[in-house]
């Protein structure tokens, strides 16, 4: 009987963990987002060759966020990070209209992978502070998100440097995690 209460207590009050993979084309803002969430400040970044990994504590959830470099030569390495991923954050530079088609191709290629079949998808439409940035509805359309079937997804307009929208995205991820457990 005590075990039932113990597991109930842990379910209600215990810390949950969620493995998050954050990917996107190079210069989309992934590393800036990671360290804004982790440190609450803007850091000077250089192109990520390989990955950064940090644990972000938010609303009693421990998010382990893997930020993987987005340069085209290293994108084939993304698949090595797919295993056990519960949430996928795909970061898009909303100001980069020339490469949004390329972003769509990479996203669809990843979502076709069997190891990501159960992962929820959060899209950060980043760089909303720039005057020519596409809004979330336009990014949704350009990425073809409405065509996704059998996958929970959400798009959040963000500005990594100010932090706008980042925690709203984590709220959605944490609610998805709670609904699955």
Curated annotation (Swiss-Prot):
Disulfide bonds: none
Activity control, per UniProt: Alternates between an inactive GDP-bound form and an active GTP-bound form. Activated by a guanine nucleotide-exchange factor (GEF) and inactivated by GTPase-activating protein (GAP).
Protein name per the record: ADP-ribosylation factor 1-like 2
Highest taxon above the source species: Eukaryota
SUPFAM superfamilies on file: P-loop containing nucleoside triphosphate hydrolases (SSF52540)
EC number: 3.6.5.2
Organism: Caenorhabditis elegans
Entry's Gene Ontology BP terms: embryo development ending in birth or egg hatching; gamete generation; intracellular protein transport; mitochondrion organization; oocyte development; regulation of apoptotic process involved in development; regulation of receptor-mediated endocytosis; vesicle-mediated transport
Binding-site residues, GTP: 24-32, 126-129, 160
InterPro entries in alphabetical order: Arf1-5-like, P-loop_NTPase, Small_GTP-bd, Small_GTPase_ARF, Small_GTPase_ARF/SAR
Family: Belongs to the small GTPase superfamily. Arf family.
Compartment(s) where it occurs, according to its Swiss-Prot or TrEMBL record: Golgi apparatus membrane
Membrane spanning residue stretches: none
Gene Ontology terms, MF aspect: GTP binding; GTPase activity
Tissue spec. comment: Expressed in hypodermis, intestine, spermatheca, uterus, gonadal sheath, vulva cells, pharynx muscle, body wall muscle, head neurons, ventral nerve cord.
Reactions this protein catalyses: GTP + H2O = GDP + phosphate + H(+)
Bilayer topology annotation: Lipid-anchor
Lipidation (N-myristoyl glycine): 2
Key word Nucleotide-binding present: yes
Keyword flag Lipoprotein: yes
Cellular component GO terms held in the UniProt record: cytoplasm; endoplasmic reticulum; Golgi membrane; plasma membrane
Keywords of this entry: ER-Golgi transport, Golgi apparatus, GTP-binding, Hydrolase, Lipoprotein, Membrane, Myristate, Nucleotide-binding, Protein transport, Transport
Pfam families documented for this protein: Arf
Phenotype caused by lack of the gene: Death during embryogenesis. Some muscle differentiation occurs although it is poorly organized and little elongation or morphogenesis is evident. Extra A/PVM neurons are produced from the precursor Q.pp, which is normally fated to die, acquiring the fate of its sister Q.pa. Q.pa and Q.pp have almost similar size caused by a loss of Q.p asymmetric cell division. In oocytes, plasma membrane localization of rme-2 is impaired resulting in the loss of vit-2 uptake which accumulates in the pseudocoelom.
SMART domains xrefs: ARF, RAB, SAR
Region of interest (Important for the stable binding to the membranes), ranges: 3-16
